[in-house]
Every structure is written in C-alpha cells, then in structure tokens.
UniProtKB/Swiss-Prot annotation:
Function summary: GTPase that plays an essential role in the late steps of ribosome biogenesis.
Domain named KH-like: residues: 363-448
PANTHER family assigned: GTPASE DER
GO terms of molecular function: GTP binding
Matching InterPro entries: G_ENGA, GTP-bd, GTPase_Der, KH_dom-like, KH_dom-like_a/b, P-loop_NTPase, Small_GTP-bd
The UniProt record lists the keyword Transcription regulation: no
Residues annotated to bind GTP 1: 15-22, 62-66, 124-127
Chain ranges of the EngA-type G domain: 9-170, 185-362
Subunit text: Associates with the 50S ribosomal subunit.
Name of protein: GTPase Der
HAMAP family cross-referenced by the UniProt entry: GTPase_Der
Binding site for GTP 2: 191-198, 238-242, 303-306
Alphabetized SUPFAM superfamilies for the sequence: P-loop containing nucleoside triphosphate hydrolases
C-alpha cells in the first residue's frame, strides 16, 4: 500500500563542506540554483527551492557546510544551519564516500541527532558499487543510502528512505501548502560588496535569514526569499556584491558575479544598494546602466545614512542627485532613498517605491493619448529641415509592450532622427505620463505612405 503524504514537507541538506549538498540541491530541484565549486564553503546562507523525486514534491533547503569552527564567522554559519534543522521535517545528513568518515562528520552527526528529527544518512559520490562499511553505522543513523548527486544515481533509493521516514498523514488533518496566487513582484537587491544588501533584507523581513558581517563578499549566491508586504507577494533576491570585472580573478567570484548578473535579467525591479560612506563609484553607475539596458525598473537606495553627519546630509543629497541625473539619463527621475538598514530607518519606504515603480514599468498608454502628446511635442520642437527643404516627421505612434514601456513610432525618414531628439521625446514623455526611473524604448519604423 502506498504511503499517504499529504502536506508539503521540508527537507534540509546538512553536512560538512564539499560533501555535495549543493549538487544534490540542484539535482532535486532540476535547476542549477546553487553554485557548485571545488572550493569548500561556497554556500553561506540557507537556500530554498521546490524539489521533486518522481511524483513526491517537497520544499528543499541547502545549508552552509558545518565545521567545528569557533570563530565568529563559523558561529554565524552554524546559526543558519540550526534554523534550517528547526524548520525541517526531515534531515538528509550528507557525507563523502571518497574521503570516508572524518572527525567533523562524527561531531556534526551528534549535533544533528540532538534535534530528534527524522534523518537519512546520504553517502554521496558513490559512482561505483558501494558496500556500507561499519564506520558509517557509527554515525548513529538507522537509515542510509548511497548516491551520486552529480550523476543522478541512487535517487529512487533516496526516495524510498525519505518516504519511509516521514509519518503517514490523514488527509483531513494535514496542512496543505498552496502556492500564493497572483503576480509575484521579483525584487533583486544588487550593488558593490559590503553595501548592506543582506542586512537590508534581514531588516525588512525581521529575521536573521541571511548571513551578515563586516567581511566583504559574504554572500556568494543569489538567495530567494518569498514574502508578503501589504497584500503583495514579493520575492526578495539577495545577490553577491559586484566588483569591477578587472578586479575579479578567482573562478568562484566569477561564478558569483555571473549568478548576480543573471538574477538582474529576470527581475521586475532592482534595488541598487549604495554605501553612503563610499558613494557613487563608477561600478555603481555600471550596475545601474546594466539594469536599464536589461529593461528592468530600478530604485536606488543609499544605506548607512545614519553614519553621515546631519550638517553634511543636504549637500550630500544635492551632489548625489546631480550625478545620478547627469550620468544615467536612461532612467532619469529614478527614485533615491536614504536609509539605515541596521537601524531599520526608512526601510518600508523602499518597498513602497518598488511597488510604485513596478506599476509604472507595467504602464499602458492608449494610442489616442500617445498621438495627442506626440503631435503637441513635435510641433513645439520640430526636427530641422533636411536638404531640399523636406522636414523629417514623426506622424504616428503606438505602444507595443510593457515591462519596459516600448513604443513604435512611424516616420518618413527615421534614419535622420538624431539621438538628441529621441532623448527630447523620451524626457518629455516621462513628465507627461509620470514615468520616472523606468527605461523607455522607442523603435522607429519607416512609413510606407510617400506623402507623410
């Protein structure tokens, strides 16, 4: 008889560094959501996804590798894993068959078993036939399975062991976890290292969900967090700090940077986090320009505002706005907020701005209003006459898409329309239709009517 598992269960992958937790995480989620690298300790935060083996669906947590590390950083990693263990219905405790059982494995298995959670010992990197040596039984788990996360072998055995460990439920009593319906606003938090991105997200959700500290570059992977704000389904995505390309030499940092850039590509809104103590470097402008080129909406947030002297704040803002508006014309009018993530000062305003600019990013303007505006704007400032006395005209336009707002404009000679005239039209449109801070795209089409 098939066992009845009604509620969606939570499974945590736990073990010392480099035993293959992130590889199994990617395997079970059927997507490459975790960075995998030979360097131990790549994962530093709890990472969540939906997992599946056959028809069995569950929530999956990847955790930092645990070591007997007494320093402050190691303790913060341990806190992340402890929270995952507390959340989980079942623990997959992972070890590496190639290295065998190490002292850390024994210490950590004792730590995990203290929580009295259902657990399966997962012996990874078993590419060949495997005999369970008595040393594995010394870890104290009564259920174990040999797998190769990299090659996908042993997944059916893993399924059997997991199902056997989970209690059977009555459908009337089981809690059913339905996905949140409606649009999900995906907000990526990006910026240079140590700008306070993770601290900001922790402050928003009121939970030490992400590892933070004074060390630059703690976050290595994009971490997704589902959240509700004022009835809106929000997916917050923390990303690794982005340094200049020329300063990135290690392969792991290249993977982290690529992961962060990829997150921007699929975002609805990007929060560009800037350190008030190191304001507006060229790299900040490069990130903002990349966001605009990808067609994403953007909100600029200056963090650590509490560390700026009151007497200097007005001059700081004046200079900041000047630089933004002169160097980022493609998102002119972008909202900028000044916060202290550490003190939770003005952090709710950031989400309100994200929701507002998201609506602008989705704005649809009727064709009649567009052409009324176009006629007025081009008559007020027409294009210059060409040779032969013929004037270039833009006679008609329509909106072809949103996200970002994109428009098709029909002209008798589109190749003669200058970039400066396009900027004039775009800036005028921003003011006329209240569209600050979002990329606006114009595509010119040559009209087939010779009399236009």
């Amino acid at each position: 008889m098939t066992k009845k598992i009604i509620a969606k269960k939570i499974i945590a992958l736990v073990g010392r560094p480099n035993v293959g937790k992130s590889t199994l995480f990617n395997r079970l989620s059927m997507r490459k959501k975790a960075i995998v690298h030979d360097l131990p300790g790549v994962t530093r935060d709890r990472k969540y996804t939906d997992g599946r083996i056959g028809s069995f669906e569950f929530s999956l947590i990847d955790t930092p590798g645990l070591e007997e590390n007494p320093d402050s950083f190691g303790k913060r990693l341990m806190e992340q894993t402890t929270k995952a263990i507390n959340e989980a219905d079942l623990i997959c405790f992972m070890v590496d068959s190639r290295s065998g059982i190490l002292p850390d494995d024994k210490l950590l298995s004792d730590f995990v078993r203290k929580y009295n959670k259902p657990a399966v010992l997962v012996i990874n990197k078993c590419e060949k036939a495997f005999d369970f040596d008595k040393e594995y039984y010394k870890l104290g788990f009564d259920s174990m399975v040999a797998i190769s996360a990299e090659h996908g072998t042993g997944m059916i055995d893993l399924y059997d062991e997991i199902i056997a460990k989970l209690p059977e439920e009555d459908s009337a009593e089981a809690e059913i976890h339905d996905p949140i319906k409606g649009d999900c606003l995906q907000i990526v938090v990006s910026g240079r290292p140590n700008a306070g991105k993770s601290t900001f997200i922790n402050a928003l959700i009121n939970d030490e969900r992400l590892l933070t500290g004074p060390e630059a570059g703690i976050t290595r992977e994009s971490i997704e967090i589902d959240w509700q704000y004022k009835g809106n389904h929000i997916k917050l995505i923390d990303t690794a700090g982005l340094r200049k390309k020329a300063t990135i030499t290690e392969s792991l940092e290249k993977l982290s940077a690529s992961d962060a850039i990829n997150s921007i590509k699929f975002a609805n809104t990007v929060i560009l986090m800037i350190d008030a103590l190191s304001p507006l470097k060229q790299q900040d402008l490069n990130i903002a320009s990349h966001v605009a080129n990808e067609g994403r909406s953007i909100v600029i947030v200056v963090n650590k505002w509490d560390l700026i002297k009151e007497s200097e704040k007005e001059a700081f803002k004046e200079e900041f706005y000047y630089q933004i508006n002169t160097t980022l014309p493609q998102v002119k009018g972008v909202p900028a907020l000044f916060i202290s993530a550490k003190n939770k000062q003005n952090i709710a305003d950031v989400l309100d701005s994200c929701i507002k600019i998201y609506k602008t990013w989705n704005k649809k303007i009727t064709t009649s209003k567009l052409n009324e505006w176009l006629n007025f704007t081009t008559e007020a400032h027409p294009l210059p006459l060409q040779k032969g006395g013929k004037r270039v005209r833009v006679k008609y336009m329509t909106q072809t898409k949103t996200r970002p707002p994109t428009f098709k404009l029909f002209s008798n000679n589109p190749e003669k329309i200058t970039d400066s005239y396009t900027r004039y039209l775009v800036n005028n449109m921003r003011e006329a239709f209240d569209m600050p801070g979002v990329p606006i795209r114009f595509n010119y089409i040559k009209t087939k009517n010779p009399y236009v």
